């Protein structure tokens, strides 16, 4: 059974990206190897609950939203996030993932909008940026 460690799942209005204003279910995964100086989600570094894809899917379904954003922490730090994104797309959600740009995005399902949070020098983690990701961004992706 495929599982992820979930910090929280919540329903809110998207406040960032081109989807700003849309009701969205956010799935916040636990864990991040980076320690950005301005991180606003340090609480997601640890703890959380292991949940199966189906358990997560049923919680998302209760919100009756078309949009799902997978965030963190750093979602790509969990190996099962790639099949989970595909699972969400197969359920006909409009899916985005917010990632630190510290991991390769080439294996992410093409139906997913990738939101790259490029690390500036002030983050103290700018050396982690994967420049190779810029070359494979799609028109539906954002920086």
Question: Which residues are covered by each model-predicted region?
Answer:
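Short, flexible micro-motifs
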Residues: 18, 24, 75-76, 120
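Glycine/small-residue-rich loop that forms an oxyanion/phosphate-binding "nest" at active or ligand-binding sites
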Residues: 46-71, 77-79
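Conserved AdoMet/S-adenosylmethionine-binding subsite of the radical SAM
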Residues: 76-143
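Short, surface-exposed acidic-centric catalytic microdomains
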Residues: 38-56, 107-116
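A secondary-structure boundary/capping signal
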Residues: 28, 71-72
